[in-house]
Amino acid sequence: MATENGAVELEIPSSSTDTAPKAAAGEGPPAAEKDPGPPDPQKDPGPPDPEKDAGPPNPEKELESPDPKKEPDPDSTKDTEAPAPEKGDGASAQPSASSQGPEGEGGLQGEPAEGSAGQPAALPQETATAEASVKKPEAEQGTPGSQDPGEAKEQKKVAEGQAPSKKGSPAFLHSPSCPAAISSLEKPLAEKPLDETLELIFEGVPVTPGPTETEPAKVAEGEKNLPGGSQKEGEEKAAGHAGQDGVQGDTSRGIEFQAVPSERSEVGQALSPTAKEEDCFQILDDCPPPPAPFPHRIVELRPGNINSQFSLNSKEALGGGKFGAVCTCTEKATGLKLAAKVIKKQTPKDKEMVLLEIEVMNQLNHRNLIQLYAAIETPHEIVLFMEYIEGGELFERIVDEDYQLTEVDTMVFVRQICDGILFMHKMRVLHLDLKPENILCVNTTGHLVKIIDFGLARRYNPNEKLKVNFGTPEFLSPEVVNYDQISDKTDMWSLGVITYMLLSGLSPFLGDDDTETLNNVLSSNWYFDEETFEAVSDEAKDFVSNLIVKDQRARMSAAQCLAHPWLNNLAEKAKRCNRRLKSQILLKKYLMKRRWKKNFIAVSAANRFKKISSSGALMALGV
């Protein structure tokens, strides 16, 4: 049933669900190739001299008379150490046609690793990297004295169980290519009950322990290797642990781009300095945002007279929908300007929903989430008084002719949305109606945004199954359309769609009507339009590909999003990224179509009311 604000309630949810047969786990790195040949035991009966003979010892000779004093070759550990591929490797850029799963449209590869909370196992291209890291024959390496000092240092790291140092950013989980173009429907994901993994994946909590103090920190991308680099890395790591607050404290530990433990540690440590970056929106703003109009407060619904405390301005409407209308108001005692959400009490369930919304908002003390000021109940309605946000909708702001939208602007907006979502999920709250209309700018000049409208939000317990059948079709996830169990990853799908629209100005699943839109969501067939995404970075495409994934277990959590390379090092990116995105022009067309649809619904409702009143039906009812 469609409503004025675009949200619909799915009256007859589809009972069809997508099942995925279990895929075989990826094979480990291949064994090392044999050396050119052992020395002749007749010519060289004694043990090989490492200074004179670079060839390997005779295996038969060692089996007959093993030397108890002989120490294991430290280079032999290379056979099992396979560093994860870096971004830009040829293997990662061209995945095989059979490496994609039907549940993962973003290029998910392989079966989820055991105990990795739904994260995919080591990527197939790691095999190629492993072959390159296999120990060379000693004849090729030369004598120990002739070995390069840098090579010896790397081999020592490997022997101690540490990952060799590498330059560049961590490898991406998915290919940044178009999911439709890389045959994402060919290889299925492993079938695993969702309720077995919810407790692990919720809030982006990693299954494996975080990096220890003995693990080496990875140099951030673009940083030069100075002589005192190791000391600098240790200082940055300590500052990262001390500076992160309660909300973003898990950011450096939550992301798992690879299934290799050493790589996960390096990723977390490389991103921890930028994960604690303060006020990302101030990178683009010349002045700080206005302070919060009032501190966070715990609100209780109480009866009272609205007109004695507030002056409602019904002519200055801010929005409306199924649950009521929103207008501006002023508190008479303080002169504080607020937004008033008026909800009609038609059934007992209406009051129950309002009480749930109040309970949810009392938990959300975050600068990127709208704050509740008061709640008053009258005999016929309930009014929620909230923080007034004057900047308007985010999409309305960025289509302004005087505004130049760049990819860095999009990063700043998306990072703040992720911050708000992460806090909600830590408070066990799911928004379930994330869409452009519910992202507002604090003012008309800055880049600070807030998430609003918790009328459809739900408290969430990972140990309990939760299903919903409402939302806005364009931004609904497949599990909502199918009336399947939902989780915190349901909000992440909506974030992926919003990010896609910010980058391109196109809605990936929008059809001619709601039915076609819902069918598009269920099929999850989408792609990166070549023309509109021409100027968009591969990191941005990879970010979206990790969110718009049909299987919710394969989507990134909010913590993993905040640790993704695309949302980090924003200050450096802002210095070199000033190209205007084409999405501004296309977003104007999208907003015009949306306004036309809203006006059409309003006019249709007025015409229906006019026909009913002219037929005398209302008079017969005594109205």
Swiss-Prot record:
Protein kinase domain residues: 312-567
Low complexity: compositionally biased ranges: 20-31, 90-102, 204-214
Region (Calmodulin-binding): 601-613
Residue positions where Phosphothreonine is found in the record: 472
Keywords linked to the UniProt accession: Acetylation, ATP-binding, Calmodulin-binding, Cytoplasm, Kinase, Nucleotide-binding, Phosphoprotein, Serine/threonine-protein kinase, Transferase
Record localization: Cytoplasm
EC number annotated for this UniProt entry: 2.7.11.18
Disordered: region residues: 1-179, 204-251
Binding site for ATP: 318-326, 341
Residues found modified as N-acetylalanine: 2
Bias (Basic and acidic residues) ranges: 32-43, 49-89, 150-159, 215-224
Active site: 433 (proton acceptor)
Family: Belongs to the protein kinase superfamily. CAMK Ser/Thr protein kinase family.
Assembly behavior: May interact with centrin.
PANTHER family per record: SERINE/THREONINE-PROTEIN KINASE
Protein name as annotated: Myosin light chain kinase 2, skeletal/cardiac muscle
Gene expressing this chain: MYLK2
